[in-house]
């Protein structure tokens, strides 16, 4: 009688382990065919940008990165002002650099030091 109970217990243990295995593989391979739709990345399409460029109303300089209308190219704003800092390099040119976690003005200070050969 005790061997019969042990056998039944072993079978129940095996069945529960097998159930757990199948649930693992079901989730791993797409939930048994019930996969959720994920949004896909938008493919690169220059026609969309070109149409926005063509429809922009500007009689001065149209910034290529932001489509802002400004008087001079070095007045163009950075595309991501909350994480980028605009640094004017002189001769009417400017670049946008990532702050990289530095405080305000630190990125421009590092660029200036690099231009002087001190960094």
Curated annotation (Swiss-Prot):
Any one of the GO BP annotations: ERAD pathway
Signal peptide range in chain numbering: 1-20
InterPro entries, per database record: LCL2
Protein's UniProt keywords contain Methyltransferase: no
Keywords: Signal
Coiled coil spans: none
Its biological purpose: Probable component of the endoplasmic reticulum-associated degradation (ERAD) pathway.
Membership in a protein family: Belongs to the LCL2 family.
Name used for this protein in its record: Long chronological lifespan protein 2
Organism: Aspergillus terreus (strain NIH 2624 / FGSC A1156)
Lineage: Eukaryota, Fungi, Dikarya, Ascomycota, Pezizomycotina
